[in-house]
């Protein structure tokens, strides 16, 4: 994703927000990052994208490599110091910063206060828009019948459930239908799908079955890892359900191929 770290114009007086792009968005779906910037700027924020940002450290942390996770976390803390807020389009990454960073440094006097300060200023995108900025409208059109997938980290660690639905319900032309077991894991789980592929395939197959039962033509969600995993299974099974990050729809930027689809679609 193109760097946008230059200071915002002085004419803007809104909060200074740093976008935590996330590895997956940067590498596989930069449009989500651009959608996040648009949503934040439309809400009055001065958005910057620090070019030196790195991974949140979650893969290392979840794999038991505490030393590497702490080293990466220190880079993140240093990079995002000085902003009013840090916002990311992923419940998974932002839960790591909000919940795990304070735990990583609770016995480290040199970093404890900084880790807690960053955690308190960090938010998942949908939560930030609704809970902090008070956004309740979406002045865009998206024609489709969608169902929403709740990511485990966003739901269980950050309590994100109604926020994206509230925003999406305001989108003209969009119908939302809840799927059975919407809160059940899709089987991605970061490194989980690599360590336990057979279990992961069974879980995502069940998820696809639940999506099928809704009759929806579109799947929406707030974590690219989950969406890529589900989209991959949908395509392998020959399903035509479109897959988008909620930010793409809310920003009016879902006029491109869905996640997992050829760009020529």
Where are these regions (language model features)?
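Iron-sulfur cluster-binding electron-transfer modules in prokaryotic oxidoreductases
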Residues: 1-265
């Amino acid at each position: 994703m193109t760097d946008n770290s230059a200071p915002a114009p002085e004419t803007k007086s809104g909060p200074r927000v740093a976008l935590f792009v996330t590895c997956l968005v940067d590498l596989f779906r930069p449009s989500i990052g651009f959608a996040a910037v648009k949503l934040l700027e439309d809400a009055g924020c001065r958005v910057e994208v620090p070019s030196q940002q790195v991974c949140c450290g979650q893969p290392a942390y979840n794999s038991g490599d505490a030393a590497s996770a702490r080293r990466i976390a220190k880079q993140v803390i240093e990079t995002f110091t000085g902003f009013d807020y840090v916002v990311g389009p992923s419940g998974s990454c932002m839960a790591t910063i909000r919940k795990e960073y304070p735990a990583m440094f609770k016995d480290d006097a040199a970093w404890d206060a900084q880790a807690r300060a960053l955690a308190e200023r960090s938010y998942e995108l949908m939560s930030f828009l609704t809970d902090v900025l008070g956004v309740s409208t979406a002045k865009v059109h998206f024609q489709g019948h969608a169902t929403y997938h709740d990511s485990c980290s966003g739901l269980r660690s950050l309590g994100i459930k109604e926020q994206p639905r509230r925003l999406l319900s305001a989108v003209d032309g969009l119908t939302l239908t809840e799927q059975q077991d919407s809160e059940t894991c899709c089987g991605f789980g970061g490194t989980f799908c690599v360590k336990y592929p057979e279990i992961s395939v069974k879980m995502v197959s069940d998820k696809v079955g639940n999506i099928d039962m809704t009759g929806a033509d579109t799947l929406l969600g707030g974590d690219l890892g989950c969406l890529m995993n589900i989209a991959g299974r949908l395509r392998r099974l020959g399903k035509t359900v479109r897959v988008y990050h909620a930010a793409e729809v809310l920003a009016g930027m879902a006029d491109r191929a869905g996640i997992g689809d050829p760009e020529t679609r």
